[in-house]
Amino acid sequence: MTVTAQPEFGLHSVDATAPVEEITKVMKHHGGVIVRGLVSEEVLQQVGREIKPFFKRGNHEGPFCERTRTVCSIPRKSRTFVEKIFGNPVYTAVCDELLTAHHEAWVGGQYFKFASPPVYNSSVAFSTLPGNSQQALHRDDMDHHGKRPACDVGQYPIGRDSIVTLFVADSRTTKQNGATRWIPGSHLQHHLGKPDLSKEVHIELERGDAFIMLASCYHAASENLSDTDERIVYSAFTINSTYRQSENVFLSLPLECLREFSPWMQKRLGFSASSPLCGWIDLTDPREVLNLPEPSDLERYH
């Protein structure tokens, strides 16, 4: 496949009241977009009360520097995070447009069309302290073995990406205190295309701002070169429901916690089957087996 020269890529921002179509248009062209003021001060304060005490345990989970503290398995720790950040209506609508799985099939002589909305993939809260080292540039869809040919920006197809990432700033993030480095346009590369360091930009955010990004983009945390700044960012990841979730939420979230959420959120967390019947228990809707309200939204072929 011959790929023509790409137009200029860069970092763009929109207001949280912007139409979803405008947000996804920028994302398909550049790979990501800043959404100013996506999360309110009231929500941030409540999420902080629920999550920040876990930072004090000093956990350094996963492939991060020892000056990075993380909180994982957030659905069982912060209901507000799940409902107001992961479940933010702008982020939800963006994910629905970019990640809903569609399929068509013949069963005998009858033709069917199926659609499965995306679900929760994972979440991590990050606290990066002064002295935090630079993270290597990477793509978030590595876990799912994302393979893609290069493509022209005008030809970006829905379904090319398996995950949409959300970063929400709890504190002001700057180049000095470790703001995320990102390479705009890298979502259009071949999956084995190397990151071009000359094109990286820093995602500088004010408290309550968010960055929504396609998981095929190269990005990484930067060094925290400040003397005193703690950079706190909340991240949420939503995935095409035909893929395996990175976080095993079925083991990390107790059923008694799950029941506190609305039926819609339970399904969004992955506690449902997808059309026509993927994720069953004994060939039965798992919500029926778990005695959860409202059945899965299935388009059955039998």
From Swiss-Prot:
Keywords: Dioxygenase, Iron, Metal-binding, Oxidoreductase. GO terms for molecular function: dioxygenase activity; metal ion binding. The keyword Iron applies. One of its GO terms (biological process) is biosynthetic process. Disruption phenotype: Does not affect the biosynthesis of penifulvin A. The keyword Metal-binding applies. Its cofactor is Fe cation. Fe cation binds at residues 138, 219. Its EC number is 1.14.11.-. It comes from the Eukaryota. Signal peptide: none annotated. Belongs to the PhyH family. Dioxygenase; part of the gene cluster that mediates the biosynthesis of penifulvin A, a potent insecticidal sesquiterpene that features a [5.5.5.6]dioxafenestrane ring. The first step of the pathway is performed by the sesquiterpene cyclase peniA that generates the angular triquinane scaffold silphinene via cyclization of the linear farnesyl pyrophosphate (FPP). The cytochrome P450 monooxygenase peniB and the flavin-dependent monooxygenase peniC then catalyze a series of oxidation reactions to transform silphinene into penifulvin A. Homodimer. PANTHER family: PHYTANOYL-COA DIOXYGENASE DOMAIN CONTAINING 1, PHYTANOYL-COA DIOXYGENASE FAMILY PROTEIN. This is Dioxygenase peniD. It comes from Penicillium patulum (Penicillium griseofulvum).
